[in-house]
A protein has these predicted regions:
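Class I SAM-binding transferase module
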Residues: 1-291, 297, 304-318, 322, ...
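Conserved SAM/SAH-binding loop
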Residues: 326
Length: 662
């Protein structure tokens, strides 16, 4: 709703219009305070142009804009709609940022941005006329560049969001995908884009319907705008049609139902090797309908392959469940043995003394002598006999980030020659993503007693929702069990390149994994092969400190290191240049404390992974005294030094003139 009449142009410089008597707009007494606070979205007058090149228009627009914004704050409006009609809006960004930082209000500001620029919708009138090359981006991408430039000027303020205006023509799917990674709060649907069905009711085309379904997943609000083009029907028929689409959209999957409320919620990765998990955490994992059925099938297949039919009554397979928790894998093993009509002897090994109480209760009440409960670290336990089969569920969202390779290699001495490990192999995957929501969430994790940028030095487990994946995931690290040399150096390094098809901004990397339990039985959280209905793992997010623009046919690169004292990094090489960083992974690798967060895999502090990030073309050196990020021009002068000091980890930076943009 316009706060002031859209044709009421106020004058703030010249008399007599400047001193015009009477109220400028309607009284706030027309509605109750609650209605103003919950039902009304303010709208800036269309004649206001704070970035006009005419000084008189610009000054008058500045004063009028501040007047309307201040009156909207006085009313307590929940949101205010402002148009974004061009690529250069520095004065608009300055005025809005000043209003946000100096005012005592919580109003959201929705920037009205069209999917396609109006000038790109007109038809060519002259045949064979040369097509002009736009200066501010290609046709499909022009308005996104407007938005990106504006939100960058406003320093990614989380109170500035997008109201996306949908026109009759839609851009390519790649462009729409990129918009869905932006903080869209509303979608504006002009009445002119609605068609008429056989009964005279307004409807949308199939392409527009698919877009509406995708926007509904982001829980955006819809604004119907324009003249009534279906006079035979009431205007509310537009809203009734949108309600019909909302009720008939595809039902959510089991994974989406479980993740409801966790969308884009940052959680610290679990470290079960270091911390003892809580009972509620075990309970959440045990509710997964897919994971343990797959484990049961893998154990069943393994038992059939290892024991001949004529020996099934005499051959007793020794199964060691490493990290038994509260016993779900033990129960899966028992069910598999009954299904295969095989005899098994089970050792349930668990280091958490609290979970051991539950295991002993299971043994006393259900399992009996067939199961032996062992309260010990699997790496330190001296087994009374060697196992035919090792079963574990030590994987994290990035496969090895919960130190599964170190644990299983440390317990391999319990496995006899020719024995089997379930899982037998697992691979981590990495994909570049763009997400203003996640970038702002990470920035908001800052704490006063920590380094001001410590929140960017750790990964987060998160249910990715409001994001745009810039390229398909690529494999990073692969581990096999059992390994011929369990004491090998586990350091690995991978350098990846991603082809990015649209102009975009890199905010970080999403990590996934795939694992082969046995034979062709797999579990996966990689989007292309995700196990249907499985929700034990959310993806992992590696943020970067400074967002990097790029894409539009350029190549993105990522370098990642895994192992004790290894170095790695990630980046995007495009129009924004190259980015370099370092990552340390391993049981002894340093870490920075992370913000506490709840959730299934988010109650522990991240201690296995540290990322140090720096400017373009930086070089990382890792030594006994920590990690240094060096400038190639002056390698003797570190840009950033991270070192352990008396049990803590301190990040030092030189004076600003030496930091080259850090």
């Amino acid at each position: 709703m316009p706060v002031f009449h859209p044709r009421y142009r106020r004058e703030f410089s010249h008399q007599p219009a400047r001193g015009r008597p009477g109220p400028h707009t309607r009284s706030d007494l027309l509605l109750s305070g609650r209605d103003w606070n919950t039902l009304i979205v303010g709208k800036l007058s269309p004649w206001i142009r704070p970035d006009s090149k005419v000084e008189a228009v610009r000054r008058n627009s500045e004063a009028a804009m501040l007047q309307e914004l201040n009156f909207g704050a006085y009313l307590g409006l929940p949101a205010f709609l402002l148009p974004l009609t061009q690529g250069e809006n520095p004065n608009l960004a300055r005025l809005l940022s000043t209003h946000i930082h100096t005012g005592h209000h919580s109003t959201m500001f929705w920037m009205r941005v069209p999917l396609l620029a109006p000038e790109d919708l007109r038809d060519d009138l002259i045949e064979n006329e040369p097509v002009p090359v736009p200066e501010d981006g290609s046709g499909d991408e022009k308005t996104w560049i407007w938005w990106h430039n504006f939100r960058t000027l406003c320093d990614y303020n989380k109170r500035i969001a997008v109201a996306l205006e949908v026109g009759p023509d839609l851009p390519s799917n790649h462009v729409i995908d990129r918009w869905l990674g932006e903080p869209i709060k509303a979608a504006i649907l002009p009445t002119s884009i609605f068609l008429t069905n056989k009964k005279g009711f307004p409807v949308l085309s199939k392409m527009h319907q698919r877009l509406v379904f995708r926007l509904l997943k982001l829980e955006v609000q819809f604004i119907v705008w324009g003249a009534h083009h279906h006079p035979e029907k009431e205007f509310c028929s537009y809203l009734q049609y949108l309600e019909y689409l909302s009720q008939n959209r595809p039902p959510p999957s089991a994974y989406e139902l479980f993740a409801k409320g966790y969308e884009d919620y940052l959680q610290s990765p679990l470290q079960p090797l270091m911390d003892n998990l809580e009972s509620q955490t075990y309970e959440v994992f045990e509710k997964d309908p897919i994971k343990y059925s797959q484990y049961q099938q893998a154990i069943y297949r393994c038992l059939l392959d290892r024991v001949p039919e004529e020996e099934k009554d005499t051959n007793v397979q020794v199964v060691m469940v490493l990290g038994a928790g509260r016993g779900p894998l033990v129960n899966a093993t028992l069910r598999a043995s009954r299904q295969a009509s095989q005899r098994v002897k089970i050792y349930a090994v668990e280091k958490n003394p609290n979970a051991v109480v539950t295991l002993e209760s299971w043994q006393y009440e259900e399992w009996g002598s067939q199961v032996t409960v062992v309260s010990s670290d699997m790496r330190e336990w001296s087994a009374p006999e060697q196992a035919d089969l090792l079963v574990s569920e030590l994987l994290g969202s990035f496969a090895d980030n919960e130190l599964s390779p170190e644990c299983l290699d440390g317990a391999q001495h319990c496995l006899r020659a020719g024995g089997v490990s379930i899982p037998s192999t697992y691979t981590s995957f990495l994909a570049p993503i763009s997400s203003s929501k996640l970038y702002n969430e990470v920035r908001a994790c800052r704490e006063k007693d920590r380094h001001p940028e410590a929140q960017f030095e750790m990964p987060y487990v998160v249910r990715l929702h409001n994001f745009h994946q810039l390229a398909p995931p690529q494999p990073c690290f692969t581990f096999h069990h059992p390994h011929p040399d369990p004491s090998r150096d586990k350091s690995q390094y991978r350098q990846l390149e991603f082809a990015v098809e649209v102009n975009t901004v890199l905010h970080g990397f999403a990590g996934y994994f795939e694992t082969t339990l046995y034979g062709d039985i797999m579990l996966s959280i990689r989007p292309e092969t995700h196990s249907p209905g499985m929700f034990s793992w959310f993806p992992i997010f590696f943020p970067i400190k400074v967002s990097v623009p790029g894409g539009g046919g350029s190549a993105g690169g990522a370098g990642l290191g895994a192992g004790r004292g290894s170095a790695g990094g990630a980046g995007l090489r495009g129009r924004g240049g190259a980015w370099r960083g370092a990552g340390l992974r391993g049981a002894d690798a340093p870490s920075l404390p992370t913000a506490a967060a709840g959730g299934a895999r988010g109650r522990a502090r991240a201690r296995g992974l540290l990322a140090l990030r720096g400017p373009a073309q930086g070089v990382v050196r890792v030594g006994g005294d920590g990690a240094r990020l060096l400038c190639p021009a002056q390698p003797e002068r570190p840009l950033l030094h991270h070192r352990p000091v008396r049990g803590r980890h301190v990040t030092e930076t030189p004076p600003p003139f030496l930091r080259l943009g850090l």
